[in-house]
């Protein structure tokens, strides 16, 4: 069983959260929109509303305690990149970030994904 953090609860993030829950993993889900967090409460271990580009908020989650951190933010590549970079700075063991284009993948890989 892994302890997993998922940041970004659009369709992709919710799908990953559901699958990991079904596999028996502990899932912490985060999004800045309350209605998205409400959608996952029934099948994740814990969920919080918050801004993942805020280092203090991320630090409060205890980033080093997660085996894997997924960044599934789809509506803002800038936020995805900032979140990925902050996660690595805060001691994330493994960061897997969503990229829609090759150039995004390159930026994410250079910044901690």
Model feature map: region roles:
Residues 1-113:
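Cytosolic regulatory regions of ion transport systems
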